[in-house]
Amino acid sequence: MKVSLPAFEKAKVLVVGDVMLDRYWVGPTGRISPEAPVPVVKINQVEDRPGGAANVALNIATLGGQVQLAGLVGEDDTAKALTLGVQALGVEPQWLNIADKPTITKLRVLSRNQQLIRLDFEESFDKQDSARLLKQSEALLDSVDVVVLSDYAKGAIDKPQDFIALARAKGVKVLVDPKGSDFSRYHGASLITPNMSEFEAVVGAVTSEADLLEKARGLLNKHQFDAILVTRSEKGMTLVTANAPELHIPTVAREVYDVTGAGDTVISALATSLAAGAELPQACAIANTAAGVVVGKLGTSTVSRIELIEALALHHGESGFGVVSEDQLAYALEQAKLRGERVVMTNGCFDILHAGHVSYLKQAKALGDRLIVAVNDDASVKRLKGEGRPVNQVDRRMAVLAGLAAVDWVVPFSEDTPQRIIARLLPDLLVKGGDYKVEDIAGGAEVIAAGGQVQVLGFEDGISTTAIIQNIMAKQ
C-alpha cells in the first residue's frame, strides 16, 4: 500500500472523554526497604503529562491538526496542572468542573526505565455530569469534521447515543475508543477501535481469523457501525467494514518500551487523517505506523509529523533513494525539506554516461544535501536527438545514474523539457550544465518564484555523448 500523509493542518477534530493527568516520579533505586521487601526509590524527577482524552488531543495537535478538547475535571491543583499541560501545545480545553470530584490522576513510580508501581487517584463521575458534558459539546459539532469519544470508563462518556446520532446527522464522523462489555452504548458510530482484549470481552474468545471476521461483522450489523478496527499488539491491526474485504495491517514497531497511550495514538492519528481527507485504509496505515513509533518511547507520549514521515519512509518504502516514480519523489522531497535538507535538481538525457557527466553531477551535489536527476525518456530523447538515439534505454540510463554516489534520486519525464516536473517538485536549487542563460532554463522561473535559486555549471571541454558516438563510428 502506498502511504503518504494528508494535509493535517486542515483537520478539525473534537475530542470528548475521560481526561486525566499522568504523573511520573523518577529516580534511582539501590536498596531494599528495611520495613518491607520493596525497593527504595530516591525521587529526583517529577513530570506531569496530559493523559487519556487529553493525550489524544495533544497527539492531534502535535501532528498539526486543529483540535478542541472537552472533559470533566475537579476544582483542584491537578486540574490546573492538566490545563497548563494541554495549553502548552496550543489546546484550549473546554472543561466542566465538578466541585466534589478529584481530577483523575495516575501516578507512576519509575526507576531504570521500569515502572515499579502505579497509584490511581480518582472517583467515577456521575451520570448527570456526563449528560452535561455531552450537551455542552453539541455546540462544537458545527466547527469540526471528526469527533473522538475517548472512553476510559471513568464516567465522562455514559450514554452517548444521542450525541453520536446528532453528530452523524450533521455529517460529522464519530470515532470511539471503547471500554467495557456493552458496545450498544456507541450505536451508530462511524468507527470503533477496540484492542483484542476489549473485543473479546464483548464477543467472546476468538479462535481463528475467520472467527474474528465473523464476530466483527456481527457487531457492525448489530450496532450499525461503519467499521471496526481491532488493534492486535504484535499481530498489527485488522480493519473490518460492511462493504469491503477485510484489511490486515502488520505491526511496524521495532522495539517496545511502553504501551502507555498507544491506543490514544491510534485513534488520534486516525481522526486527524480522516479529518484531513484520507481514505480509511490509508488512515489505518498511518495510525499503525504512529503506534509503532509511540511504543518505542517511555510513558505517555505523542508522535510528531516528522517522526511519522520518517517511520512511513522506513516501513512503506515510499521515500527510498534511487530510481523512483514522480509521486514517490514528491513524497521523498517533502520529507527531505522537513529535515531541513537543501535539495538540488538537474536534468538531461545522459545517454552514454561519461567523465564529464560524473564531474558535473559531483559539482551539483556539492551545492546541497540531496541531488535529483530528471531523465528524458526514450521517446523524448528521440525527438530531441534524432534517429538512432538513445543508445541506451531509459531504465538502463537511470540505473547507471542511481549507482553514482552523488545522486540521490533519479526520475523519468516524457516531455521535451522538464518544466512541468520541476514546477511540481520545486527544488531549492535548479542547476544546468553548459552555456545557458538563467532565464532560458526550463523550470527556472517557477523555482525562482517559489523562493529557490537557479545556477549554471560548466561542462568539461571536449567531452560529450555525441563526440563519443562519432568517435566509435569513426573507428569501425
Swiss-Prot record:
EC code(s) of this entry: 2.7.1.167, 2.7.7.70
Pathway recorded for this protein: Nucleotide-sugar biosynthesis; ADP-L-glycero-beta-D-manno-heptose biosynthesis; ADP-L-glycero-beta-D-manno-heptose from D-glycero-beta-D-manno-heptose 7-phosphate: step 1/4; Nucleotide-sugar biosynthesis; ADP-L-glycero-beta-D-manno-heptose biosynthesis; ADP-L-glycero-beta-D-manno-heptose from D-glycero-beta-D-manno-heptose 7-phosphate: step 3/4
Reactions accelerated catalytically: D-glycero-beta-D-manno-heptose 7-phosphate + ATP = D-glycero-beta-D-manno-heptose 1,7-bisphosphate + ADP + H(+); D-glycero-beta-D-manno-heptose 1-phosphate + ATP + H(+) = ADP-D-glycero-beta-D-manno-heptose + diphosphate
Molecular function in Gene Ontology: ATP binding; heptose 7-phosphate kinase activity; heptose-1-phosphate adenylyltransferase activity; phosphotransferase activity, alcohol group as acceptor
InterPro entries: Bifunc_HldE, Carboh/pur_kinase_PfkB_CS, Cyt_trans-like, PfkB_dom, RfaE_dom_I, RfaE_dom_II, Ribokinase-like, Rossmann-like_a/b/a_fold
SUPFAM superfamilies: Nucleotidylyl transferase, Ribokinase-like
Region (Ribokinase): 1-319
Ranges where the record places region Cytidylyltransferase: 345-476
An example Gene Ontology biological process: ADP-L-glycero-beta-D-manno-heptose biosynthetic process
Active site (record annotation): 264
Chain positions recorded as ATP binding sites: 195-198
Swiss-Prot/TrEMBL keywords: ATP-binding, Carbohydrate metabolism, Kinase, Multifunctional enzyme, Nucleotide-binding, Nucleotidyltransferase, Transferase
GO-annotated cellular components: cytosol
Family to which this protein belongs: In the N-terminal section; belongs to the carbohydrate kinase PfkB family.
HAMAP family assigned: HldE
Subunit structure: Homodimer.
Function description: Catalyzes the ADP transfer from ATP to D-glycero-beta-D-manno-heptose 1-phosphate, yielding ADP-D-glycero-beta-D-manno-heptose.
Name used for this protein in its record: Bifunctional protein HldE
